[in-house]
C-alpha cells in the first residue's frame, strides 16, 4: 500500500475504535490510574516522565513497577552489585516522589538477567491486578536496534501480562481479573500519539537527576532528551512532547492492524 492508503486506513481504524469507546489519542488524559513498568530504575523517567508528572498533577493515580534491581548500571568497578542495587532503589523512590507517583513496586530480578518466563509474566500480571490501571506503560519490545535483553524481555512480558491479566482462569490465586484499556509503549520507533508535556519537562529532568549514580553518563542524555522532546513537540505544534505507541487491548492479539495505527 502507498503512504496515502496506509494513512487513510489508519484514520479508518481510529474512527472504528472510537465507535466502541477506544480513543487512543485521549488515552493518556482519561486514565484514572496509570502503571509505568520499567526494566530498570530510571526507565520510566526517561521514557514517560513528563506524562507521569502531568497525569499526577491532574489527579490521576500513577504507579511504577521496576522489574530489575539496577545492579549492573555503573561504569565504576569498585562498587558491589548489592551496594549499587540499594543505592538505585533509593534513587528511584526519590525520583518517583518528584513525579507524584503514589507507589513503586519492585520485582527484584538481577539487572541484565531479567528472565523471560511464565513466572515473571504472572508476577507482572499480579501487580496489574492489584493496581487496576486503565493505562499500562512499557518499553516497546519491537524497537529496532534495542541491544539490551532486559528491555526486549520487559516489553514482551508486559505485553503478555497486559493481555493475560484479564483472563479469569489465568493465575486465579493472584486476584480478580483486570483488563487495562490501553498499553502505551515508550522507547518506540513507531509512535502514534504525542503527549504534550510542555510545562512538565523540567519536572521530568528533575526526577532524572535524582538518579545520582547514573549522572556520569546522564548529562548528555538529558540534553538529548530536551532535543527529542522539542522534535516530538513539533509533530503536534507544542513546545515539548513525549512519543508513545498506544494500543487498545483488542489490538494486541491476532490483529495485524496494530502495525498500521
What residue spans do the PLM features occupy?
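Active-site rim/loop-helix segments in enzyme catalytic domains that contact anionic ligands
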Residues: 1-131
